[in-house]
């Protein structure tokens, strides 16, 4: 049986056990060798002897099958006091198997990582003799393992001294490679522990350690792992008991656990009785290759003396191992080894360079050294610049009052207040206009995700206007992209380069309808006279004068259309029985009159009267002269409409024909406020058209 842990039949059950010793027994068969094994039941102190044929190799599938049959739960499902001895033994065995599996997987990843690092580190050779490293031949390795298992757990300090002096007398040898299979088997068949002195002793001994031989580290692939482990022991670990060199190879994948795991073990003095069971014999095993024997001989003797006495162990080291849980020493070994792996590989390189400063290096690759100096990473200061969402001159979407989202230009920005002054994109943009100040939250970037949806919404009421704005912005971006123009959209609109786009708004078919900001139509017209300035600060009541005139004109429409009170008067004018100044001007006019006074301000009222007059013309079509039939619309607007309105005013208001005609010529009676607003509108239109005419 080559396995360290087996399954044996004890008390009618398969119990996991640890092999303590094996001895060959006589057998009738010459081919098969029988062994007598002495095993210890895991988590129990029971030691039994049995034949090798009565045991099975311990594997995970068998343990899980037994646990499933017993209905065992996970490790954290119940307190340890409630578990049976058989259940504890199975869980200890399962934990050992899991540790083996993780160890083998991590060693594979460790080899790959060190292989990549070895390609980037320059090799260095020291004049000092390399550290001693001993191992037995591969053929004698099984015998060596048997000797370790059969040897006594404790040795006298004199024996350890002899082994140390023997190590010193041997000649220095180069690091030899050990196959991965031998490494794995040595990890499985050896257990060990270490003592932890005080921090001050650790610091003193760090100064006395020899530096690592970098050339030996990078020469052979497997030697890299051994030497890196040795350096970690020299830098961070206190003096250790002589251990197998194979046990120092630990994968870097086990770095995750912190050093608290090892420190917590110092507080368990009651378990120190099992301390000596896991220390190997220094006389038979290879010496520690990481320690200088000439410097560390007193410390090694003190270690062996401390290991020989359990009582002194509890007083000096306070390191203990549980006798009831044999897997505890194994897990502690793993956690302590993880602490040695915390040294970064770059620190190894720096340490090797520091130790070889005064030595003459051999076979130095200068190009590699130069590359290392160039690849040295200096401290980096990462500056996070805040990207402002809006900038001056940026085109955005802005929603104002009842209008939909409309393209606008940012004139200025106040960062602290997070506000921007914007102007709508329209046919009469002017950089001198005062924009409206709004919060950033009310703005959207022009190329946002909702761009198409905003355009479609604006097309519902401003189809031509929004299309013109989009074409203006697209043309501006094309000019910026090709480099033919540099500047903001406002500057582009005022320049001659934008005239092909601006001239579209001057066409008769274009509806000049754009959203207006409050300061365009309200404040600027009100600045015409002092009277309107005062009114801008007062609450303006709605104008009722126009409504009163519409009601009075409604009576005139009823008299003309419904009562047909003007029909006889109109027929008399057409027949020539009554004279009319409007008929004379119509006959003498050489061209179409540019302006006609309608008197009616409501278009509905005017349409109603014109339709009635067309019916009258159809009735008298037979008797109408030929010169009237050629242009009926002109005859209705210039002759019949004024005569009908004058006749209705005379009849409704009780005036004679001359007074009614004078009232018609005077037109509607406008109020003072209506006149001011109308004059201000005219002046504003003239001012607005003046810059555009100069640009052309």
Swiss-Prot record:
InterPro entries: MUM1-like_PWWP (IPR035504), PWP3A_3B_4 (IPR040263), PWP3A_3B_4_C (IPR048795), PWP3A_3B_4_N (IPR048765). It comes from the Eukaryota. Keywords: Phosphoprotein. Disulfide bonds: none annotated. Residues 119-143, 278-303 are annotated as: Disordered. CDD domains: PWWP_MUM1-like. PANTHER family: PWWP DOMAIN-CONTAINING DNA REPAIR FACTOR 3 FAMILY MEMBER, PWWP DOMAIN-CONTAINING DNA REPAIR FACTOR 3B. This is PWWP domain-containing DNA repair factor 3B.
């Amino acid at each position: 049986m080559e396995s360290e842990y087996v399954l044996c039949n004890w008390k009618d059950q398969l119990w996991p056990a640890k092999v303590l010793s094996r001895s060959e027994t006589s057998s009738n068969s010459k081919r098969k060798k029988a062994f007598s094994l002495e095993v210890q039941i895991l988590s129990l102190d029971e030691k039994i002897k049995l034949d090798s044929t009565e045991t099975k190799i311990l594997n995970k599938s068998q343990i899980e099958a037994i646990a499933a049959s017993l209905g065992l739960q996970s490790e954290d499902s119940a307190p340890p006091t409630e578990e049976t001895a058989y259940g504890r033994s199975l869980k200890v065995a399962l934990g050992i198997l899991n540790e083996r599996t993780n160890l083998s997987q991590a060693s594979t990843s460790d080899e790959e990582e060190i292989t990549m690092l070895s390609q980037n580190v320059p090799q260095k050779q020291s004049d000092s003799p390399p550290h001693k490293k001993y191992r037995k031949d591969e053929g004698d390795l099984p015998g060596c393992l048997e000797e370790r298992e059969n040897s006594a757990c404790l040795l006298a300090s004199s024996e350890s001294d002899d082994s140390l002096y023997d190590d010193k007398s041997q000649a220095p040898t180069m690091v030899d490679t050990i196959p991965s299979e031998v490494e794995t088997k040595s990890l499985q068949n050896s257990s060990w522990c270490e003592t932890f002195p005080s921090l001050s002793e650790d610091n003193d001994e760090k100064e006395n350690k020899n530096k690592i031989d970098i050339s030996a580290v990078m020469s052979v692939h497997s030697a890299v792992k051994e030497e890196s482990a040795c350096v970690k022991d020299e830098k961070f670990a206190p003096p250790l008991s002589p251990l197998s060199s194979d046990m120092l190879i630990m994968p870097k994948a086990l770095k995750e656990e912190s050093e608290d795991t090892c420190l917590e073990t110092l507080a368990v003095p009651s378990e120190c009785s099992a301390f000596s069971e896991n220390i190997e014999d220094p006389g038979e095993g290879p010496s520690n290759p990481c320690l200088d024997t000439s410097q560390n001989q007193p410390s090694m003797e003190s270690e062996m003396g401390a290991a020989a006495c359990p009582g002194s162990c509890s007083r000096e080291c306070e390191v203990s191992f549980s006798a009831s849980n044999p897997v505890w020493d194994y897990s502690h070994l793993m956690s302590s080894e993880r602490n040695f792996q915390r040294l970064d590989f770059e620190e190894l390189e720096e340490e090797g360079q520091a130790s070889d400063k005064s030595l003459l290096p051999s076979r130095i690759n200068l190009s590699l050294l130069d590359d290392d100096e160039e690849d040295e990473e200096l401290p980096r200061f990462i500056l996070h610049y805040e990207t402002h969402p809006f900038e001056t001159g940026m085109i955005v979407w802005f929603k104002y009052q009842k209008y939909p989202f409309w393209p606008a230009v940012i004139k200025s920005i106040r960062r602290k207040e997070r506000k921007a002054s914007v102007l709508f994109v329209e046919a009469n943009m002017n950089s001198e206009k005062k924009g409206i100040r709004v919060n950033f939250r009310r703005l959207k970037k022009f190329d946002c995700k909702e761009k198409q949806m905003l355009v479609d919404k604006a097309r519902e009421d401003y189809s031509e206007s929004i299309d013109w704005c989009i074409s203006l912005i697209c043309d501006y971006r094309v000019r910026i992209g090709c480099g033919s123009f540099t500047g903001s959209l406002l500057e582009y609109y005022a320049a001659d380069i934008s005239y092909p786009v601006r001239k579209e708004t001057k066409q008769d078919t274009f509806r000049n309808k754009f959203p207006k900001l409050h300061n365009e139509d309200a404040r600027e017209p009100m600045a015409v006279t002092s009277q309107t300035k005062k009114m801008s600060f007062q609450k303006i009541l709605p104008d009722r004068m126009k409504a009163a005139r519409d009601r009075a004109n409604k009576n005139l429409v009823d008299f003309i259309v419904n009562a047909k009170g003007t029909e006889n008067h109109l027929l008399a004018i057409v027949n020539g029985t009554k004279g009319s100044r409007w008929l004379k001007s119509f006959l003498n006019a050489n061209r179409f009159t540019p302006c006609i006074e309608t008197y009616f301000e409501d278009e509905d009222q005017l349409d109603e009267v014109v339709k009635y007059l067309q019916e009258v013309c159809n009735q008298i079509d037979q008797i109408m002269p030929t010169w009237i039939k050629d242009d009926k619309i002109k005859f209705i607007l210039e002759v019949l409409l004024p005569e009908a309105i004058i006749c209705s005013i005379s009849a409704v208001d009780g005036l004679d024909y001359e007074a009614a005609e004078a009232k018609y010529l005077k037109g509607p009676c406008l109020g003072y406020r209506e006149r001011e607003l109308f004059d201000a509108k005219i002046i504003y239109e003239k001012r607005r058209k003046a810059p555009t005419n100069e640009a052309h």
